[in-house]
């Protein structure tokens, strides 16, 4: 293991709002009306920038120098890796939303366990300190609050940290969010995310498209429009846009601290979309990692134990990954989180 390297594990923040004149009729664009200059100022505080972007009728998707930002009419998702100061975005985003007549309804902050925890700035050296900073940034109206550290017995160093706050005890979000964290990537597969000789002639967008094709990422969801970006000399990010559904992948391929993440939002009961277990199988197969963790957040959807078991069966059958730990916790106003840890059967 390297003494120091780039921190791949992301910090993730999700803010959900409601319109003071609900339903949203006067301002159907909602948060999407925030001008780019204002967003750029927020990202400057976080210590990252926009490197590529795409939009459709439902939302705006930005690839950042450190991960991704998604802006929906009443929801913002921002995840950043490295040593970024993600929590500095909370207050300015709430302020920008208030100027549009939107009031904060719920907040969720989550992250895995850092590979290089000592390299993180305050408050990210302690989850307890992070929770304090988040709580101080939120209005008192978000009174249903909970912090939890979900620690798998097979690998305590890969805990999942979650803090939620909501104005309502029942969740308003009928979307399931799946977050996959992968470490110790297959070395051959990881080579796809290094720029090759001659790539200096291409820009980062075209090099990113080549990485998308060579790695097989374009096969994970054939219906998605992919906005991708290749970093120099290595590393990769992409956002996928499919109707009102997003997906995102980030890769730190260096040996010794290799890491990749895959995230998507979906409905379990939408017949127009694929079985999540098959999607996860294809995403994980791109990287062939030695360690996989999957955090699934059931918002307004009821927790579905059969989906959890199906994911375990498919990953065992197709990728020879065995589920070593399965944890579950409930968060008022934010739903149920299931955290699964996998390693190859040979381990």
Swiss-Prot record:
Reaction catalysed by this enzyme: S-adenosyl-L-methionine + H(+) = S-adenosyl 3-(methylsulfanyl)propylamine + CO2
Reported induction: By auxin.
KW Lyase (keyword) present: yes
Protein modification: Is synthesized initially as an inactive proenzyme. Formation of the active enzyme involves a self-maturation process in which the active site pyruvoyl group is generated from an internal serine residue via an autocatalytic post-translational modification. Two non-identical subunits are generated from the proenzyme in this reaction, and the pyruvate is formed at the N-terminus of the alpha chain, which is derived from the carboxyl end of the proenzyme.
Positions bearing Pyruvic acid (Ser): 67
Free-text cofactor note: Binds 1 pyruvoyl group covalently per subunit.
Effect of deleting the gene: Reduction in the length of stem internodes. Increased thickness of veins in leaves and inflorescence stems. Altered morphology of xylem vessel elements. Altered homeostasis of polyamines. Hyposensitivity to auxin and hypersensitivity to cytokinin. The double mutants of bud2-1 and samdc1-1 are embryonic lethal.
Stated name of the protein: S-adenosylmethionine decarboxylase proenzyme 4
Keyword vocabulary terms for this entry: Decarboxylase, Lyase, Polyamine biosynthesis, Pyruvate, S-adenosyl-L-methionine, Schiff base, Spermidine biosynthesis, Zymogen
Alphabetical list of SUPFAM superfamilies matching this protein: S-adenosylmethionine decarboxylase (SSF56276)
Naturally occurring in which organism (per UniProt): Arabidopsis thaliana
Lyase keyword on record: yes
Protein purpose: Essential for biosynthesis of the polyamines spermidine and spermine. Essential for polyamine homeostasis, and normal plant embryogenesis, growth and development.
Gene Ontology terms, MF aspect: adenosylmethionine decarboxylase activity
Family: Belongs to the eukaryotic AdoMetDC family.
Pathway linked to the protein: Amine and polyamine biosynthesis; S-adenosylmethioninamine biosynthesis; S-adenosylmethioninamine from S-adenosyl-L-methionine: step 1/1
Enzyme Commission code(s) on record: 4.1.1.50
Pfam families, sorted: SAM_decarbox
Biological process annotations from GO: plant organ development; spermidine biosynthetic process; spermine biosynthetic process
Cofactor (UniProt): pyruvate
Disulfide bonds: none
Feature type site, description Cleavage (non-hydrolytic): 66-67
Catalytic residues, chain numbering: 7, 10, 67 (schiff-base intermediate with substrate), 81 (proton donor), 237 (proton acceptor), 250 (proton acceptor)
UniProt binding sites for substrate: 66, 254
């Amino acid at each position: 293991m390297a003494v120091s390297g780039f921190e791949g594990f992301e910090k993730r923040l999700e803010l959900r709002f409601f319109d003071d004149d609900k339903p949203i009729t006067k301002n159907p664009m909602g948060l999407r009306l925030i001008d780019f200059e204002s967003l750029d100022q927020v990202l400057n505080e976080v210590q990252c920038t926009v490197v590529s972007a795409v939009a459709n009728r439902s939302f705006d998707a930005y690839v950042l120098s450190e991960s991704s930002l998604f802006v929906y009419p009443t929801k913002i998702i921002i995840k950043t890796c490295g040593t970024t100061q993600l929590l500095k975005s909370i207050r300015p985003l709430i302020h920008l939303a208030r100027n549009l007549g939107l009031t904060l309804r719920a907040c969720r902050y989550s992250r895995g366990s850092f590979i290089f925890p000592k390299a993180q700035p305050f408050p990210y050296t302690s989850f307890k300190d992070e929770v304090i900073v988040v709580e101080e940034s939120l209005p008192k109206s978000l009174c249903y609050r909970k912090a939890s550290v979900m620690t798998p017995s097979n690998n305590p160093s890969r805990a999942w940290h979650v803090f939620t706050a909501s104005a309502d005890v029942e969740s308003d979000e009928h979307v399931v969010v799946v977050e996959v964290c992968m470490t110790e990537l297959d070395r051959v597969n990881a080579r796809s995310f290094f720029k090759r000789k001659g790539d200096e002639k291409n820009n980062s967008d075209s090099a990113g498209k080549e990485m998308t094709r060579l790695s097989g990422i374009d096969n994970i969801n054939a219906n998605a429009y992919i906005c991708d970006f290749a970093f120099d000399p290595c590393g990769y990010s992409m956002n996928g846009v499919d109707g009102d559904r997003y997906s995102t992948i980030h890769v730190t391929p260096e040996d010794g601290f290799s890491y990749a993440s895959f995230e998507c939002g979906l409905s379990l009961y939408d017949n127009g979309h694929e079985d999540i277990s098959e999607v996860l199988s294809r995403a994980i197969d791109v990287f062939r990692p030695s360690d996989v963790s999957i955090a699934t957040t059931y918002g307004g959807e009821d927790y579905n134990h059969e989906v959890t078991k199906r994911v375990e069966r498919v990953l065992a059958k197709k990728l020879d990954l065995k589920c070593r730990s399965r944890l579950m916790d409930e968060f008022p106003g934010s739903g149920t989180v299931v955290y699964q840890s996998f390693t190859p059967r040979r381990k």
